[in-house]
Each structure stands twice: as structure tokens, then as C-alpha cells.
A protein has these predicted regions:
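N-terminal export signals
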Residues: 5-26
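C-terminal segment of N-terminal export signals and the immediately downstream linker at the start
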Residues: 20-63
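Structural beta-strand segments of beta-rich domains
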Residues: 73-77
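Short amphipathic, basic-aromatic surface patches that mediate peripheral association
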Residues: 80-89
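Short coil-to-beta strand junction motifs in C2/discoidin
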Residues: 89-95
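Solvent-exposed serine/threonine-rich low-complexity stretches and specific carbohydrate-binding patches
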Residues: 105-114
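Exposed aromatic-hydrophobic patches
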Residues: 119-128, 154
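Short acidic/polar inter-strand loop motif in beta-rich domains
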Residues: 144-154
């Protein structure tokens, strides 16, 4: 390798390293909150639904649905993220909310980190009679927070007639 090629390569490498360091510093300034990586290893659920931790209060999906529904008739299911309003800013937000009826996906809404919104979604659901042969079905909601991972909440619904 000649001297000129060596100097050119060394200079470009040094510049790239400097840019990378500057980009990392800018990212650190813009995204000051560190994410707890252990929250991304599994599906997070409330350890004790009667006594939620501050983290659980902001992240466990809360499902509001009738206790009893009639098969084949539409009803409303509201899914909110936590009992406490979750921030929706550029550094901390809910990416999506989804609802499953039993093991079947029913709907999913993608969220955007634009301002301080109240992440809450309303679904209109119809449960076919054959979907709940035992007369009960579980509604399962999931949400994903960019800093605190994937969270789940569920509620059982009685299905009649």
C-alpha cells in the first residue's frame, strides 16, 4: 500500500469514527431515557392485579367490555393503556394496541409519537356462536411501549345464545 492510499484510508476512518461518536452523543441527548432491556425478553403482565406497581399502572392494557354478550351480536370493547395516562412523545410512546378474541386476532391500531395523547382504542366485536362452545371467551389486549416492552391484559366474557 502506498503512503497516499494509507493516509486517505486513515483520514476517512478517523472522520467516520468522529461522526459515529457525534451521532451517539446526539441520540443520547434526544433519547435520554434508558430502556430496561429485561422488559423486552417476555410478555409483561400484572404480577398482582389488585396492587399494580407504578410501571404496571402505566402499561398493563385495561379492557372495558360487557360481562355478558350475545353470540352474533356486535358489542364494543375499549382498550386503554394503563390506569394512568401514558405519555406519547418523541422519546416515549405506545407503538400499537391490539385485541385478540381468544387466540384469534381481532384488530390492531398503530400509534404515532406525536404529542401527549391518551392511547385508547375502541373495537366493535362480534363473537360467533361456535367461537365460545363453553359459553365463555377471553379477550386479550396487547400493547408495546418503545421503552418498556410488550404488555398484556385480559378479561373473560360470558357468551349467551
Amino acid at each position: 500500500m502506498d503512503r497516499r492510499t494509507f493516509l486517505k484510508t486513515a483520514t476517512l476512518g478517523a472522520m467516520a469514527a468522529g461522526i459515529t461518536r457525534e451521532a451517539a452523543a446526539a441520540a443520547e441527548k434526544y433519547f435520554p431515557v434508558k430502556a430496561d432491556q429485561s422488559l423486552f425478553a417476555t410478555i409483561n403482565r400484572a404480577k398482582d392485579p389488585a396492587k399494580l406497581s407504578p410501571l404496571e399502572q402505566k402499561h398493563v392494557p385495561v379492557i372495558k367490555a360487557p360481562a355478558t354478550v350475545k353470540a352474533g351480536e356486535p358489542f364494543t370493547v375499549e382498550v386503554a393503556v394503563g390506569e394512568v395516562v401514558h405519555p406519547m412523545g418523541p422519546t416515549h410512546w405506545i407503538e400499537f394496541i391490539e385485541l385478540n378474541v381468544g387466540n384469534e386476532p381481532a384488530g390492531r391500531v398503530e400509534m404515532q409519537p406525536r404529542g401527549f395523547l391518551n392511547p385508547k382504542v375502541t373495537f366493535t366485536v362480534v363473537i360467533p356462536k361456535d367461537a365460545a362452545p363453553a359459553g365463555k371467551i377471553t379477550l386479550v389486549a396487547h400493547q408495546r411501549c418503545n421503552l418498556h416492552g410488550y404488555w398484556e391484559g385480559s378479561v373473560d366474557v360470558t357468551v349467551t345464545g
